[in-house]
A protein has these predicted regions:
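Extended catalytic cores of very large enzyme megasubunits
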Residues: 1-202
Length: 202
């Protein structure tokens, strides 16, 4: 016997002229709540993001009220990135500030630029590389052929044995990279591979 279960439909008061607004909002900007199976409503997203903007901009009460009126009435909105991360504890950490930007661009002049672009991408910030000759001609020449070998199985290290940061050990002409299981760890391991490709010690 098939029984129809009542499904509670989530929705926000978006204009009927914007039929894709609800699915886009709940897919992209509404964060999961502590209670399993629930997501932020439009009102809760407004509460979170407006609070974050007021704190960040040190806004006056009049400025805050104007922003609130504009956002809640869908007359003006912050960036899409801000709708997702604005007002969160994650964004309050200085190392994550760039995650509030929709996009950035980076002059590719050294290997740290590649690390920066990976870090930005892992934060969800769109990042572009400026590859003009005046920049990329500053990159060091590749001089070492790397033979990369993965040791161990991905995902098999138990949680309390995982490292947060990447560590590199060099013995003779062999480098062992212990990849930290974090954004910083992955960025550092990627940048280390690039640096090893031009390292004059080898």
């Amino acid at each position: 016997m098939v029984r129809e279960l009542e499904r509670k439909q989530l929705g926000a008061d978006f204009p009927q002229t914007a039929p894709a607004a609800n699915p886009v909002f709940f897919r992209t900007y509404s964060r999961r709540q502590q209670i399993e199976g629930t997501r932020e409503s439009w009102s809760e997203v407004c509460d979170r993001t407006l609070k974050g903007l007021v704190e960040l901009g040190k806004l006056t009460q009049d400025e805050a009220l104007l922003l609130e009126e504009m956002q809640r009435n869908l007359k003006a909105l912050p960036s899409g990135r801000w709708l997702w991360v604005g007002g969160t504890n994650w964004l309050a950490q200085p190392k994550n500030f760039s995650g509030a930007y929709n996009c950035t661009s980076t002059n590719v002049i050294d290997w740290s630029a590649f690390g920066l672009m990976m870090d930005l991408a892992m934060m969800g910030c769109g990042t572009g590389a400026i590859l003009e000759p005046k920049y990329i001609n500053q990159l060091p020449s590749i001089r070492n052929r790397l033979n990369v070998k993965v040791v161990g199985d991905i995902g098999k290290t138990i949680a309390n044995e995982r490292r947060e940061f990447t560590e590199t050990k060099i013995e003779g002409n062999q480098a062992t990279i212990y990849v930290g299981d974090s954004r910083d760890g992955w960025v550092q391991s990627y940048q280390t591979l690039l640096e090893l490709s031009t390292d004059e010690r080898f």
